Amino acid sequence: MSSELVKRHGHTHYANIPYGYYVLIVSFFYLVFLGVLRIILKPRAAGFNSSKRSRLAQKLYLVNPVVHLPILLVAVLLPFYRHYSISEHATVYIKRLGRLSYALLPLNLLLNLRPNWLLRNNYTYTDLIPLHKWLSRCIIIIAVVHGILFLINWALGESGTLAKKIANPYNLAGVLLFAPLISMIFFSIGPMRRFSYNAFYVIHNLTGISFIFVVAFHARPSVTIPYLLINIAILLWQGFAKFYYAKRTDILSKNTDYQNTNLVNVQLPRMALPDQFEPACHIRISPYSRLHPLYWLYPSHPFTVASLPSDTVVDLIISESHHPKSFKLELGAPYSVINNFDPAVPRSCLEQAKRVAIVCGGSGISFGLPLYRYFKEIHPVEYIQFIWLVKDAYQLKILDKLDTIGLLDGSNDCHAFITRSVDDPNSNQETAPDLEFELESMTQDVVDENGAFVSERDGSPTSKFKFASINLGRRIDWATDLSQFVEPALVDNTWLLTCGPSDLIESGRQYAADNSINFASEIYAL
């Protein structure tokens, strides 16, 4: 039997099996490497003025694909060209590309686990999404190059070789896989993904499943053991988690003021979440039941929980899009709430922080509010400052809808910054009004030298919540508004937490880097 195989396939038929095992071993040690990184590196921010070493450490800590992908690819490609001459055994290396793409699949699937039970103590699954995206693209490109090179090799062979090779059912399976792979590349382009995320997500899932099983049929020698079995085990776990950790629930209430703001408050029953969960965790919501096919094909939607475990309801604060196709939670419709996922805030912050500043924009209040309450009520710290940036005063009133904040008093440490005037008739439009008009509108109010309310005008659409100050017509000045925040002796236990658009987060990161303090963030749209 063995002599027949050698005659049919040649002595290089099994040449790539050791290389596939090598890639699998590298994947295992890379996961160990990820775990060790969060133990030895601190969540210190690095900015423009930081050293190269600090910027590299930050990229390593944040699992930035710019750093992590080259590390991984260099490790797996080091022994790629080995033993066989490429001029005499070109097909060995073409096959090796195919085995490389499939051998990387287990790692890529593990990076996409939700929640990631392998790295749960150190990472949230959102930390690993950028690397998962870029590794997916690399796998697809490697697989496509593998296929193209074989087609070229056959086309350059003897007459009729190409047709004969494609007629082989194993080879035909690989050729047919081109269509979903090319579609995946096309729909993963930013504009196409934004145009129809549902289409991208469906193609992403179907292509992934097809790749796992079609390549298992296509590959020779077989990749069933161990690769296919590992991939199936991971898929089964993902399916189990998405089914078992989901609860079907209705919406208790939806508080809106569409005439003045797109911020809405949605309340879910307390039973939608387990007895204990961490502040600023998030859930994913699907409009479909677990038995509906679209529950598995279409994406679920993430929402940050604005409540604490002691609350009687689960509050969500959402910035609703005006786009007719955007997902909206509506009264009277049942939804599936999938799991609760850990927040972007490290456990070390929740357990060891002594000085905390929270800066959030717009619907990022759903991230900041539970953390603010946590550091005031559950884990009191010696210094807490909460800053909320909003487009207009009407957005502040969303706090009046929250029964969960109870008697919370922000009169000493909670500050609002309103970037538009309450008198501006276009305050709900996307274009920012002229700053001079904003400043003129403040002349009827009593303000301090920083532009903060010290008394409110009758009829002003501000919240009943007790703020220390409400600042009109200006954004945060990090150095001034947080002038009492940083104590040099306590920087190891000092945390700046930000949530909002990327510009706000990058400004916060720069401030944290300049002051050598810890930093954590979550990106929202303001």
UniProtKB/Swiss-Prot annotation:
One of its GO terms (biological process) is reductive iron assimilation. It is found in: Membrane. Its main location: membrane. It is a multi-pass membrane protein. It is an enzyme of class 1 (oxidoreductase). It comes from the Eukaryota. This is Probable metalloreductase AIM14. It comes from Zygosaccharomyces rouxii (strain ATCC 2623 / CBS 732 / NBRC 1130 / NCYC 568 / NRRL Y-229).
